[in-house]
Regions:
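Cell-envelope/extracellular polymer assembly enzymes that use nucleotide-activated donors
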Residues: 2-4, 175
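Acceptor/aglycone-binding surface of glycosyltransferases and processive sugar-polymer synthases
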Residues: 53, 57-74, 79, 91-170, ...
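Short, well-formed alpha-helical segments that are part of the catalytic scaffolds
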Residues: 6-25
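Donor nucleotide-sugar binding loop of glycosyltransferases
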Residues: 12-15, 37, 90
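Short hydrophobic beta-strand elements that form part
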Residues: 4-8, 31, 54
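A conserved acidic beta->alpha catalytic loop
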Residues: 34-42, 87
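Hydrophobic helical membrane-anchoring modules
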Residues: 142, 167-293
Length: 293
């Protein structure tokens, strides 16, 4: 069974040597995608025997993941793991994450930072952001996950062949899960521990969080338009009709129109109608696209 570990990296010359040296124990091949680094990440990786994919410029985390997926497919990997280069993931957890794939229990195994309550404490702002994003993601998949944004994952050969990531940003984590769920691939989580010693993140937390949330909403709304737009549309339509009926009742009794009540009613009806139309149109488009795949 061929196990491949893919590592997206951006200016990680301080960490990459130690990670590659220790990952070799668990992998038949290691792929490093250098996403436009201006340090020695590529050179160090090549010297240590890793297969290096080098982007000419920084394209984003999703672009790096996509390049790693393509190379792992080319290598005909039986198990493909993604592992961050920032030093947060523990290399000794690789067998834990890959085990469900090796034993053919699931197609996508996610290393969750929230299943092990004894794991080191995550910064509160990250914990809140990840939980919000995970709740949004769970609207579009069958499984109820605790950590949809973990970059420590393992994929079966089937998942590797059938999933093609397209998002070039941090939204790729959500995109992969939604595509896996739509393809009826089995997804499960396993507990991992994470190191939060020092500031290992290379992203501004506000812009990073906003980008991920917007990407998550985008993929959720596209893949489940009836749920995402249809349910709010029905709610607004019902509220609007109640207020319109109330306006009519008041007018019948007093011959007066209460402006605030009528505006709320009309506005809610219009908004509800727009959301329902959007849901139907998007659902039709998605259905046609899926039927042609």
């Amino acid at each position: 069974m061929k196990i491949t570990v893919g590592i997206p990296a951006y200016n990680e010359e301080k960490n990459i040597a130690g990670i590659i040296s220790r990952v070799k124990k668990y992998a038949d091949s290691i792929i490093v995608c250098d996403d436009g680094s201006n340090d020695l990440t590529s050179e160090i990786s090549e010297q240590l025997g890793a297969i290096v994919i080098k982007h000419s410029k920084n394209k984003g985390y999703g672009a790096a993941i996509n390049s790693l997926f393509l190379k792992a497919k080319e290598l005909e990997s039986d198990v493909f793991l993604t592992f961050d280069a920032d030093g947060q993931h523990r290399i000794e957890d690789i067998p834990v994450v890959s085990d469900p794939i090796i034993k053919n229990r699931v197609d996508v195994a996610i290393g969750s930072r929230f299943l092990d309550t004894k794991s080191e404490e995550m910064p509160n702002y990250r914990k809140v952001g990840i939980k919000i994003i995970t709740k949004i993601t769970n609207l579009s998949i069958k499984e109820k996950l605790t950590d949809s944004q973990s970059g420590f994952r393992a994929y079966s050969k089937k998942a590797l062949q059938e999933i093609t990531p397209s998002d070039e940003g941090m939204g790729v984590s959500t995109e992969i899960l939604i595509k896996a769920s739509n393809l009826e691939l089995k997804i499960a989580e396993v507990p991992i521990k994470v190191n939060y010693d020092g500031d290992t993140s290379t992203h501004d937390p506000v812009s990073h969080g906003t980008s991920v949330i917007l990407s998550t909403i985008k993929f959720t709304s596209i893949h489940n338009p009836l749920k995402f737009y249809g349910i709010p549309g029905i709610i607004f339509l019902i509220i609007g009709l109640i207020f319109v009926a109330w306006t009519i009742q008041i007018y019948a009794e007093t011959q007066e129109i209460i402006t605030n009540v009528s505006l709320i009613g009309i506005g809610s009806v219009v908004l509800g109608t727009i959301l329902l139309i959007t849901a139907v149109i998007l659902f039709s488009i998605v259905t046609v696209v899926n039927s042609k795949k």
